[in-house]
Structures are given as structure tokens and as C-alpha cells.
């Protein structure tokens, strides 16, 4: 199977990935190639870090309604929301369809795709954007996420959790990421096996249609919930969420500090926050 390793390294090199693997870094079965049971998932980590590098700190904006902003500012709590709230927006689906992840797309007896109950229920996230925005982007965010009397929070994020990453956007509908596509195609065609990327169920959440969402240039903080381990979700009616206390490193691995508040009129908030009036 040294030829298989050589082919994998050849694909990595051609796609710009510097790392190389050896035979001991992967597990080869009759049907699959993976590093799922390896203590150091060298191949999967190399691919993930190349396509979706982790971000340890960033200054970002979060656009939201006045009501939500006042809740955050006065309670000192920021929420990660359940990704199932965006079931109809192409979350996870876009990645699975484009990259032919049939297992997640299979439907149950109720007609629901498997990803809806295998991935969505325990995936929580928050969306942010870059502070260097064009005039067009600024208008888009105010209009779509903070219309009328909405608020923009400038936030300093420090992440111990590796799942603070930038989104990848599909520039051509149905065209997969070349690195993943080339690797999968090579292993399937030459060795009649399927390549399994460790963490794929998590990475599905960092991919959306560029045509629909590319303007957002989104940073995403993600947290996966596991029963009996770490923070557990709370509910507010039909919605579930994870609470992040501001100004300290949370159990989820994120520290959020609000440095400025921008709006047309100052929201109700503690005097310790810096307010900047937004222009018309």
C-alpha cells in the first residue's frame, strides 16, 4: 500500500498542502481509508487546517436586533444557537450534496435526511463578520441582521476551542472542494476504497453557497454538545442554546469581550460599555 500513500501525498502536494503522511498514519480496511482511530489524525488534521484553519483570536462584528443586544449587554451572556434553526437555509445540506455524502443525505421513514438528527441537534454556533467591511457589506449587514433600530457589537474573541474558523463558500454550484474531491476520486478509482475525513460532521457546518451567502465573509464559533460532557443546552420555547458568559474563558473554549456598541440610538446598557452613534 505504499503506492496509496504516495498517491495521497501527491494529491496533497498538488493542492498546496505541505504535510506528508506515512503508512503508519492511516488505517486501511477492505472498504475504507481513514485515520479515525489514530491518536494523531495527521492526514485529516492537515486537510482541515489547510481548508479551515483554526483562529485563536480575532476582532469581529456581531449584528443583531436591539432587543437581543440589550439582553447580551445587561445579562453578560452571549448565546450559541442551535444550527437546526437554519434547517431550510442550506446549512450542512450544501456540503453534503456537493461532496456526495450519501450517508447523511439518506432519508428516514419520516422523510427527514439523517443529518437533521445526527448532526444538527448537538451543533451550536454564533456568526460574526470581519471589521474591515465595504460600504456594500455594511449596508447588507445592517439591513439583514440589524434593521431599523438594530445594534452592532464589536467583539474581541479569544478561542481555545479549535472550531473558531472562517466559512468556506461554494463559488460554483455543485463544484466540490478540489482537495477533497481529488483525494476521494483517487482512492476510489485506484484502490476501490472510500476516504473518510475525521471530523467531517463538524466541518459540514463551515460551508455554504457563495451565491447566497458569500457577501457575509462569516467567522463562525462552533460547539458540539455531548451528553454528560461539558455545557448542556438550555431551552427558550422551541429554541435551544448554549450560554457563554462574557469576559472570561467559557467551558466551551471561547472568551468574548465587547469593546464597542454601535447603533443609531444608544441601547439600554451598563455605563461601562463604549457607545458610538451610527451614521444615517
Residue spans for each PLM region:
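Partner-binding and oligomerization surfaces adjacent to conserved cores of proteins
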Residues: 1-280
Amino acid at each position: 500500500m505504499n503506492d496509496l500513500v504516495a498517491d495521497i501525498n501527491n494529491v496533497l502536494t498538488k493542492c498546496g498542502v505541505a504535510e506528508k503522511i506515512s503508512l503508519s498514519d492511516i488505517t486501511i480496511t477492505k472498504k475504507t481509508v481513514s485515520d479515525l482511530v489514530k491518536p494523531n489524525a495527521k492526514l485529516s488534521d492537515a486537510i482541515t487546517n489547510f481548508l479551515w484553519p483554526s483562529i485563536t483570536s480575532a476582532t469581529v462584528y456581531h449584528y443583531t436586533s436591539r432587543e437581543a443586544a440589550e439582553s447580551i449587554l445587561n445579562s453578560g451572556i452571549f448565546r450559541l444557537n442551535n444550527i437546526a434553526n437554519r434547517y431550510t437555509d442550506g446549512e450542512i445540506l450544501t456540503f453534503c450534496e456537493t461532496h456526495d455524502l450519501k450517508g447523511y443525505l439518506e432519508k428516514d421513514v419520516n422523510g427527514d435526511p439523517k443529518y437533521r438528527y445526527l448532526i444538527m441537534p448537538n451543533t451550536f454556533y454564533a456568526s460574526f463578520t470581519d471589521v474591515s467591511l465595504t460600504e456594500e457589506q455594511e449596508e447588507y449587514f445592517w439591513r439583514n441582521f440589524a434593521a431599523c433600530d438594530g445594534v452592532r457589537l464589536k467583539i474581541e474573541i479569544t478561542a481555545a476551542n479549535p472550531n473558531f474558523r472562517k466559512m468556506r463558500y461554494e463559488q460554483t454550484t455543485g463544484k466540490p472542494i478540489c482537495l477533497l474531491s481529488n483525494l476521494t476520486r483517487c482512492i476510489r478509482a485506484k484502490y476501490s476504497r472510500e476516504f473518510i475525513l475525521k471530523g467531517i460532521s463538524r466541518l459540514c457546518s463551515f460551508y455554504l453557497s457563495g451565491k447566497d451567502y458569500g457577501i457575509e465573509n462569516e467567522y463562525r464559533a462552533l460547539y458540539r454538545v455531548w451528553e454528560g460532557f461539558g455545557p448542556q443546552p438550555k431551552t427558550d420555547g422551541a429554541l435551544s442554546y448554549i450560554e457563554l458568559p462574557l469576559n472570561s474563558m467559557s467551558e466551551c473554549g471561547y472568551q468574548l469581550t465587547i469593546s464597542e456598541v454601535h447603533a443609531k440610538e444608544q441601547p439600554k446598557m451598563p455605563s461601562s460599555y463604549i457607545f458610538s452613534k451610527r451614521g444615517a
